[in-house]
Amino acid sequence: MKVIILMTSGPRTPWRCASPFYIAALMAANEADVEIFFNMDGTRLLKKGVAERIVPGEPNCLSPNGKKLKTVYDFIKDAKQAGVKFYSCKQAIDSLGYKPEDLIPELDGVFPASEFALRAMEADKVLTF
């Protein structure tokens, strides 16, 4: 099964930022082909240092030892480890003035919104956050 998640939530809505990565990791662990496409405020999570500073405060945000609260970046790394692919909207990256060296290493690629539209039409499911 092919699943695409459109991630428009970002630093302005921190309480919405963990669940997409958590759900993506669960789906990938169950052999789904999962991509997350970042756009709008979600694109800001791709800048180095941003996601590390956001703690969503949801019940699933405790680390495995139950002590440290997980950051959004921890959830991004978990999803990446599960096999989730990360892509961003080129127009959003350009409008924020981000350069390749500004972006987290987990990002797999940047392409225009038109490519997202084509991928979304081919996917079995599209989720938006």
Where do the model's predicted regions map?
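Histidine-anchored nucleotide/phosphate-binding helix
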Residues: 17-30, 36
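Ligand-binding beta-strand-loop-alpha-helix segment within the catalytic cores
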Residues: 77-80, 85-91, 98-100, 105-107
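Short internal beta-strands
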Residues: 34-40, 86-90
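Short, glycine-rich nucleotide/cofactor-binding loops
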Residues: 5-18, 46, 64
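A glycine-rich helix N-cap at a beta->alpha junction
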Residues: 54-87
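Short, basic, glycine/proline-bearing loop/turn elements
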Residues: 7-10, 56-64, 98-103
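Anion (oxyanion) recognition and catalysis
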Residues: 28-29, 80, 120-121
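N-terminal beta-loop-helix "entrance" segment that forms/cooperates
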Residues: 42-55
